Each structure stands twice: as structure tokens, then as C-alpha cells.
UniProtKB/Swiss-Prot annotation:
Quaternary state and interactors: Heterodimer of an alpha and a beta subunit, which further assembles into trimers and the trimers into hexamers.
One Pfam assignment: Phycobilisome
Matching NCBIfam families: phycocy_alpha (TIGR01338)
Protein name: C-phycocyanin-3 alpha subunit
Membrane topology of this protein: Peripheral membrane protein
Keyword Transport listed: yes
Binding, (2R,3E)-phycocyanobilin: 84
């Protein structure tokens, strides 16, 4: 079962053999929050390609060796650059999944679980993705509650990478 604030509230009440009470207020709050989350997911999805491309350029600026080092895991060729943009897009897509479900379940299940092994196997530096996510956070164009929602999932991934 995917972990969300609502599923956790139901599990808690059920384990205590009681009906939902204060959890209903949490549920209503989550429904209000869901509108902002969905707005953020829609906006990030619409801009995903341009955000991933610009975030890759931010990585190249901060870590110029990524474009001068030869090898399949670097951006010294167009194929390498395409892979970098693809990978950043994957991180962004996982952020939108978290926004849609209202919890970190997809991030935990699809990204964080195997992250260390993937980075080690392919010699990928977490600092590249941290830089890309920081760029996306600073430039996604969201404001208000949608920005707060998106930024919380971006920060969650940054913390997991750190």
C-alpha cells in the first residue's frame, strides 16, 4: 500500500479499533492541499523538458569536468548530454508522482531504494543531481502553496542524496 497521510491515519485508527476523529480534519486538510499539489504536478509536467534541459546546463556549469571527461556516464558527447537530461527528467517525474499521491511513497519506492547502488554502479555523482534539483527548485516558476508542495518533495530528494 502506498504511504500517504490519509492511509497512515486510517491504519492508526484501525490499529486502535476506533473510528476516524481528528483524522477527519487531517483528511479535509489533505483535500485542500491536494489542489495545490495537483497544480504543481501539472505545471512541472508541462515544463519538464525545458526544466531538465536547463538543469543539465546548470550541472555542466558547476561541474565542467562532466562535459570534458570521456565515458558513457559523462556529458562529453551528445549521447551523454541526452542521458543527463533524461536522468534529471526522471527525478522531476518522481517529484510529480509524490505530488499526485500526496506522499513520499513513490520517491521511497522508485528512487531512493536503489539510488546508492545505481550511482555506485554507473559512477554517477549525487552532487550532479543535487545541483539539478536545486536549479529546478529555484526556477520552476511556481509560487504560493503549489511551490511549497513541490519544494517539499524536491528537498526530500535532495536530503536523500546528501
Amino acid at each position: 500500500m502506498t504511504k500517504t497521510p490519509l492511509t497512515e491515519a486510517v491504519v492508526s485508527a484501525d490499529s486502535q479499533g476506533r473510528f476516524l476523529s481528528t483524522e477527519l480534519q487531517v483528511a479535509f486538510g489533505r483535500f485542500r492541499q491536494a489542489g495545490s499539489s495537483l497544480e504543481a504536478a501539472k505545471a512541472l509536467s508541462k515544463k519538464a523538458s525545458s526544466l531538465a534541459e536547463a538543469a543539465a546546463n546548470a550541472v555542466y556549469q558547476k561541474f565542467p569536468y562532466t562535459t570534458t571527461t570521456s565515458g558513457p556516464n559523462y556529458a562529453s558527447t551528445q549521447t551523454g548530454k541526452d542521458k543527463c537530461v533524461r536522468d534529471i527528467g526522471y527525478y522531476l517525474r518522481i517529484v510529480t508522482y509524490g505530488l499526485v499521491v500526496g506522499g513520499t511513497g513513490p520517491i521511497d519506492d522508485y528512487l531512493i531504494g536503489g539510488l546508492a547502488e545505481i550511482n555506485r554502479t554507473f559512477e554517477l555523482s549525487p552532487s550532479w543531481y543535487i545541483e539539478a534539483l536545486k536549479y529546478i527548485k529555484a526556477n520552476h516558476g511556481l509560487s504560493g502553496d503549489p511551490a511549497v508542495e513541490a519544494n517539499s518533495y524536491i528537498d526530500y530528494i535532495i536530503n536523500a542524496l546528501s
